[in-house]
C-alpha cells in the first residue's frame, strides 16, 4: 500500500507510514483544535511543482488571511506559494449555490490544477448546504469517485462534533477519520488526536497527545508496552548500588536490568539513595540519567558535592545527565519520548525517576493511564537491560499503609526498598528493609539507615524492635512499645 507521508513528527508512526495514497480522509475537531495547521503542514511538506497541493477555502475570508496564517509557521515556504501550493476561495460562491453546485465547482478546480493533494477547509460548510442527507451522500460519492480516478489524496477538514461521526453520511463513505481534540483539565489545556478509521491500513489506536509550536504540530504517541513481549535475554549479573551494606541485603547487589522502588516518607532519604545509586554507577563506568520533577539540577549537584562526589567532572565526562521537568506542565507521553531520546544518546545503563508520584500530574487527562504508563516505562527499561530506580513518597510518618498493592507501583517494580522513621532511645532514626527482590534472594532484616555527609550512606545494625516496627512508634525496649 503506497502512502503519502505527513512529515508531522511521530504522526506517520501512528499512521503506519502515512496516509494511504488516493484515499479520502476527514480531519475533524472543534474550532481551535489544530485542523487547519495540520492540513497546511502536510501540504507544504509534500507539495512540489510536479506534485501540487490544492487548498480550497470555503470560509469566504480573504486568501491573504489564509496565507498570513500559514506564514506564522516554520513549514511555510514562500517559494512554493502559487506553483506548488495553490489556494482557491469558493466561500463567496458558496453562499449563492447549493451543495451539488459546490461539488461541481471543486471538481472544476481539481481538473484545472491537477493536484496530487486536495484540501477542502471547511468541508462541513458544504454538508450544511445540502437539502437532504441522501443528496449529500450522492455528491460525496461523485467527488470521491472522481478523485480516486485521478490519483488524488484528499483531506476534508471540518468543525465536526464527536456525535457527527454517527450522524453525518460523509463519515461512513470516506477512507479515514482523524479526530483532533483540545480540552481543559484544571488550568491546562490538553491537545490530542486519535485515528477513528483507516480503511485497509493498520494504525496505532488510542489517544495521542500533540502540541502546536512555531515548527507546527508535533505528536507524542501514546506510550504503551508492545502487545507481544520483546525477545531479550535477562541478565544474571549483579550491579552494585555503591551504598555500604545495601548490596549485602540483595545478596551482592541488584540484578542488572531490574527496577527498584525506594518508598518512604518525606526526608527519609529517597532522593539521596537514588542519587548515590546513579553516581556510584558512574564510578563503575555506567552512564546514567537522573529524571527529576522536584529537585532541579542545581540542587542535585549541591547534594552530590556535599557527599563528596566530583559531580562537575562526572558530568563533564558525560557519565551522568540531569533531566528536570516541572510536574505542573508535564505531559507523560511527551516526557517519556524525551527521556528515551536522552537515554539513547547517552547510552545510559542506569536511570533514576524521582518520583513516580509526580507523574500522576501528567496523567491528569486520563488517570487510568498512570499505572499503564509506569508499567510501560519499566518494561522499556527492562527490555533494554537498563537498571532503574524509582522513588515514591509515603504520606504517613510512623503510620500504617506501608505497601502499595494491586495496581500500585510496588506491583510493577522488581525490588522494593522501604525507608521508615523509628523512635529509639528518644531519638528519631531511619530504618531500611528490603520488602521484595523478584526472583532472587533478599534479606528480611530491618536495619538502621545512616545518612551522613561525612560517612555517606550506610546500612547499619539490626534494629531491636517489636513486630510492629514499621507501622508504629518503635522504642529500643519492646516493653515500652506504645501502639
Map each language-model feature to its residues:
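Flexible loop/N-cap segments at domain edges
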Residues: 241, 247-267, 272, 280, ...
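Conserved inter-motif catalytic segment of the P-loop NTP-binding fold
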Residues: 49-130, 286-365, 369-372
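Walker A/P-loop NTP-binding active-site region of P-loop NTPases
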Residues: 15-76, 249-311, 412
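Hydrophobic/aromatic beta-strand patches that form the interior of the parallel beta-sheet core
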Residues: 25, 54-56, 86-88, 155, ...
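P-loop NTPase motor core
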Residues: 25, 100-173, 177, 330-416, ...
Amino acid at each position: 500500500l503506497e502512502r503519502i507521508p505527513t512529515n508531522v513528527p511521530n504522526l506517520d508512526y501512528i499512521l503506519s507510514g502515512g496516509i494511504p495514497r488516493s484515499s479520502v480522509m476527514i480531519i475533524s475537531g472543534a474550532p481551535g483544535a489544530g485542523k487547519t495547521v495540520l492540513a497546511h503542514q502536510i501540504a507544504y511538506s509534500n507539495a512540489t511543482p510536479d506534485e501540487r497541493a490544492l487548498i480550497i477555502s470555503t470560509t469566504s475570508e480573504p486568501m491573504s488571511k489564509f496565507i498570513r496564517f500559514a506564514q506564522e509557521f516554520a513549514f511555510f515556504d514562500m517559494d512554493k506559494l502559487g506553483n506548488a501550493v495553490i489556494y482557491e476561495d469558493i466561500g463567496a460562491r458558496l453562499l449563492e449555490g447549493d451543495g451539488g453546485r459546490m461539488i461541481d465547482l471543486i471538481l472544476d478546480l481539481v481538473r484545472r490544477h491537477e493536484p496530487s493533494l486536495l484540501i477542502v477547509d471547511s468541508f462541513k460548510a458544504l454538508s450544511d448546504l445540502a437539502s437532504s442527507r441522501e443528496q449529500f451522500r450522492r455528491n460525496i460519492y461523485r467527488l470521491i469517485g472522481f478523485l480516486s480516478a485521478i490519483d488524488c489524496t484528499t483531506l476534508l477538514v471540518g468543525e465536526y462534533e464527536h456525535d457527527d461521526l454517527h450522524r453525518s453520511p460523509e463519515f461512513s463513505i470516506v477512507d479515514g477519520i482523524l479526530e483532533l481534540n483540545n480540552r481543559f483539565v484544571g488550568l491546562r489545556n490538553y491537545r490530542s488526536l486519535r485515528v477513528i478509521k483507516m480503511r485497509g491500513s493498520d494504525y496505532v489506536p488510542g489517544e495521542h497527545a500533540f502540541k502546536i509550536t512555531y515548527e507546527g504540530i508535533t505528536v507524542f504517541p501514546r506510550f504503551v508496552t508492545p502487545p507481544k513481549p520483546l525477545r531479550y535475554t535477562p541478565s544474571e549479573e549483579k550491579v552494585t548500588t555503591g551504598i555500604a551494606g545495601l548490596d549485602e541485603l540483595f545478596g551482592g547487589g541488584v540484578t542488572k536490568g531490574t527496577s527498584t522502588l525506594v518508598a518512604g516518607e518525606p526526608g527519609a532519604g529517597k532522593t539521596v539513595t537514588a542519587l548515590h545509586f546513579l553516581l556510584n554507577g558512574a564510578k563503575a563506568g555506567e552512564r546514567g540519567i537522573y529524571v527529576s520533577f522536584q529537585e532541579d539540577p542545581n540542587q542535585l549537584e549541591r547534594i552530590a558535592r556535599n557527599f563528596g562526589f566530583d559531580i562537575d567532572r562526572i558530568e563533564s565526562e558525560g557519565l551522568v545527565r540531569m533531566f528536570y521537568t516541572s510536574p505542573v506542565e508535564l505531559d507523560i507521553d511527551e516526557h517519556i519520548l524525551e527521556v528515551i531520546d536522552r537515554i539513547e544518546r547517552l547510552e545510559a545503563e542506569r536511570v533514576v525517576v524521582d518520583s513516580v508520584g509526580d507523574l500522576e500530574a501528567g496523567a491528569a487527562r486520563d488517570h487510568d493511564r498512570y499505572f499503564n504508563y509506569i508499567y510501560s516505562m519499566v518494561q522499556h527499561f527492562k527490555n533494554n537491560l537498563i537498571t532503574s530506580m524509582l522513588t515514591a513518597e509515603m504520606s504517613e510518618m510512623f503510620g500504617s499503609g506501608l505497601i502499595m498493592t494491586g495496581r500500585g507501583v510496588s506491583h510493577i517494580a522488581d525490588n522494593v526498598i522501604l525507608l521508615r522513621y523509628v523512635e529509639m532511645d528518644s531519638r528519631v532514626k531511619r530504618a531500611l528493609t528490603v520488602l521484595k527482590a523478584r526472583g532472587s534472594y533478599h534479606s528480611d532484616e530491618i536495619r538502621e539507615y545512616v545518612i551522613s555527609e561525612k560517612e555517606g550512606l550506610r546500612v547499619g545494625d539490626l534494629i531491636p524492635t517489636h513486630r510492629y516496627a514499621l507501622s508504629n512508634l518503635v522504642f529500643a525496649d519492646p516493653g515500652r512499645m506504645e501502639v
